[in-house]
């Protein structure tokens, strides 16, 4: 009898031990945010703020051609660390310095992969890390959010993967978002109707497509990605038509970290503006020499259709030399170091080496130098792709920068073009 009791107690202890191993918690440095991770058929996680559960039963997986990472995960070990440091951006956008404090949990699994979680005082993030010797094909990624109740969603919904990211935002209850509705680009903003707002976004995107989100019709949000384009056809002066796609979303190095999926969790809208999560999660700068980078304000004629008006406009306004000298004078008067010349400075959009004679770019560069105002030129990405030596040529002319436009895609090929 004692033998059976002992075996029963041993079995109970074993079960409780397994459950304890399969439930893992990570707290933010201030203890306000908690990530609860469970390992079963998938990797699940909940997010709580001040004991209020804001995200529940979310799951994550990465499907490769040969295997699915995160499916029936087998934990081989875990490592924790805490970081408290100050980051100094080369080009400050919001702050001259950024406090970067977080607690990190690295979960190592069998089959050559890990999942890394970070908990900040204003949000959480996770990413996959793989350790394969050969290149891998990524078939898809499962980013799944199960909302505990009806939330208000703020979405930008394009017609498809080809988008200029200029659609107006929709503001809809999460239960009203149908699978047949348009998907959303990132970021999306989730209003819990209670204490918190959650900004969902990604960071450190490299050699991988952008993530889009859609509804499954059950108050859940899932991920969808553009596939790798294999063949292109002509589609005007600033675009290519995708004629053939692969059955995978990325073909990439097998030993790498994947993009961060992050949630900025705030109580007040103003803290969304102050959010620096994208910068804090970005890979370290790879440039050795950054002395040539000169950030500054720019005057851009596209906003007003290149047609200035007023008592001081004593010339025929338009895409011509007099109008752009007027813009240079305006910039010089108000201490703006750059003007941006949009479409029209070149004779055609496909020839970046022949300036529009009505504009006289070389005279404008000379005139701008007299006024301490430099010039940035607009170009379509397709023109840049076909004329990569133009950077050297325009630099020799005295042009200080290029605004590359109309990418309108975010598949792996185009993301690599960004880099």
How should these model regions be labeled?
Residues 1-23:
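Bacterial Sec-dependent N-terminal signal peptides
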Residues 23-285:
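N-terminal accessory beta-strand-rich subdomains and adjacent acidic, glycine-rich linkers
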Residues 128, 331, 405:
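Conserved, mostly hydrophobic/aromatic
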Residues 242-244, 279, 325, 343-347, ...:
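Intrinsically disordered, low-complexity acidic regions
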Residues 249, 253-330, 334:
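An acidic-aromatic substrate-binding cleft motif
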Residues 261, 298, 337-338, 374, ...:
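Beta-sheet entry/capping signal
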Residues 329-336, 369-370, 395:
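Sec-exported extracytoplasmic/periplasmic mature domains
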Residues 341-419:
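Aromatic- and carboxylate-enriched substrate-binding clefts and catalytic-loop regions
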